[in-house]
Amino acid sequence: MAEHNLIRQELNKLKQMPPWGRQQGDRWDKLSNFIYHTQTLADLWARIVEVAWREKLEPREFGAYAVRRWYNHHTHDQILRLFYAHPTVEPESDAKHRTVDFYLRGLPFDLKISRFPAAYPQSLKYGWQHRHHLAHWLYVHQSQQGRFHTGNRLFIILHNRLAPVLAWQLRRDFEALAQQVGHFLEAPTLLGLTLSQAGQTHRPWAGVIFYVKS
């Protein structure tokens, strides 16, 4: 518990989210894999400077990359724990499984957390009311980013009405997220999708949870 409290305190210390600055790639992912075992921002920046100096990288650019990965990983991990706390959810035993985070009523799911996509062709209200359409769009859109798989997914969509660019801060609002996750898990609405890829038809299940801050 103390460890979880520490990482949450450190996540709250981040005042600004730096831009990626470059497309995510295998080399910089490998060089920044220390983010998985680094809890404090002070230790994070110490490792960033160390690796940047050793690999002759620009510290600010590499730092932005590593900070984003650190924040996204640890907020994802903490949000997963909100699911694990519910009696209908069973964690995947292999923490490195690429497409399954947990089982909901026996069905495997991959958790995806993102801001409401600016490229979505409809409004937030439309996506809220037509979650099947939004979920289908997210699958297709993510296929264009090289992250496509046809397994079941549970999407958490974040949106700050007053400042959409600050949606990243909602990833660490664990109290509000716990309420949204708990509400969904009490009576899960699962959407049956039909997807086509390389001449094959896939029918995954999807769920969509919104956290919208006014």
What are these regions (language model features)?
Residues F102, L107-R115:
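Conserved catalytic cores of phosphodiester-cleaving nucleases, focusing on short active-site segments
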